[in-house]
Amino acid sequence: MTPSAKRRTLNTHYFMPPHVRVVELMTSGNTAPEIMSLLVDRMKTVGLKPFVAKRESTGFIQNRVWASIKREMLHVVAEGIVDAQTADDIFVETIVRPGTRPFAAMDYVGLDTVANIERTYAQERHLDTTYTVDYLQREFIDVGKLGIKSNKGGFYPPSTAADAVSTKPRIFVLDNGLSGQIDNLKQGKILEYSFEGEYIRTVFKDQYLPDGIAVSQEENVLFWTCMGSPGQKDGMIYAGKLDGNDIRPLIQQGIVHTPKQIVIDEANKKLYFTDREGLCIWRCDKDGSNLEQVVVTGDNNNECDRRDATRWCVGITFSHTLGKIFWTQKGASKGWQGRIFSANMTIPPGETAAHRKDKVCLLEGLAEPIDLDFHESTKTLYWTDRGEMPFGNTLNRLRFDDRGYALHTDSTPHLKHEIIARKFHEAIGLKIDARNEHVYVADLGGSICRCKLDGSDKVRLVFQEDRAWTGVALA
């Protein structure tokens, strides 16, 4: 190879499966620096994530790390400590799913503690400490860099060390199965994506038009609704573990009509969900028992009522701060008949779900409001609207005062509420991440988006044209 050709030669490593967009770049020993920079820029423009090794290394970066993981995994199985399935499971639960970053985790534990642990392993297994304990002692511990507990930081600067180990939520989203070839209506799926929007796995499949989803952080359980055939009394409510096991029906067919959004009241161990053609809102225990109606908007045995879309309950949320439930009655598709209501979480004495004097219409004439969520600390109601422009396919919010009265605004002309994000494609699912001050929106067009609580910094995390997203939840 000529000297000129050597300067244009380098090592690359692409990853499988194809949705992993990482590529490693490494010099051949003669590669011109400008060639490396050029390739990094070009790869970023086509959606790849390039990583450059600083020097030549057998296995590049990731396979060097992966080799050591494989060695230890083989050791714990070969030594009879655990079986392969259990070793895989604990690795996924403690490293993969939380998105644990090894160096950030070491900073969090403390580098002096890490060194002591490694020293014990080295003594027990007669390991060389040159690149572990000795390296930590010389480069970090001796100069006072112990991780987040020291003002000098560790592998990360002190201001970012704690942030680097903060848990980012996993995204669970429903695909109703209607965006591809439709052979039957039981092609819905529950999928998991990372905080960055990378596909992780399909949790459950073969679902009958799934629509609403919620996560119990206390129990690591998913709850979701399946609409069944629209207009028929064959909707169902399911629960299943986050790991994809123990799926079970909570509400069997023949009880509810078309269940839509579902939310969890962890404080009272209750589930709330709307029933579109059932013309009501239901509440039950987390095991499906003690099912009761809390709001009724019409007679579901009456054909006229059942066909009246202004009576259809779709979105549901609640606020313990205000002691209220909120729900949407969407109206006809793109019909500008949508309304948002509130009522007390407890039915007033002497009243019934069908006759409640505490029921209040907060907003009316909306394009087509769908799912809801409530941000407690700011007393703000958020919702998606899948109606037409100029006010549809939007993310919206309405603030409340301490007494629970709506604070109407004129920030958007002709409206009493705020539109904070636009240009969704049939916006449906909605979930607030209060910890990180984010809002997630899923739409039927195949996009999952995230923005700040004020609607700024909107980014599309996922776009899959062959998906029709409905509900979205976080864990």
From Swiss-Prot:
3-hydroxyacyl-CoA dehydrogenase-like protein; part of the Tox1A locus, one of the 2 loci that mediate the biosynthesis of T-toxin, a family of linear polyketides 37 to 45 carbons in length, of which the major component is 41 carbons, and which leads to high virulence to maize. One of the PKSs (PKS1 or PKS2) could synthesize a precursor, used subsequently by the other PKS as starter unit, to add additional carbons. GO terms for molecular function: oxidoreductase activity, acting on the CH-OH group of donors, NAD or NADP as acceptor. Disruption phenotype: Significantly reduces the production of T-toxin and decreases the virulence to maize. Keywords: NAD, Oxidoreductase. Its EC number is 1.1.-.-. Signal peptide: none annotated. Pathway: Mycotoxin biosynthesis. The keyword Oxidoreductase applies. It is an enzyme of class 1 (oxidoreductase). CoA binds at residue 149. NAD(+) binds at residues 99-104, 245. This is 3-hydroxyacyl-CoA dehydrogenase-like protein LAM1. It comes from Cochliobolus heterostrophus (strain C4 / ATCC 48331 / race T). The lineage of its organism: Eukaryota, Fungi, Dikarya, Ascomycota, Pezizomycotina. Belongs to the 3-hydroxyacyl-CoA dehydrogenase family. GO terms for biological process: fatty acid metabolic process.
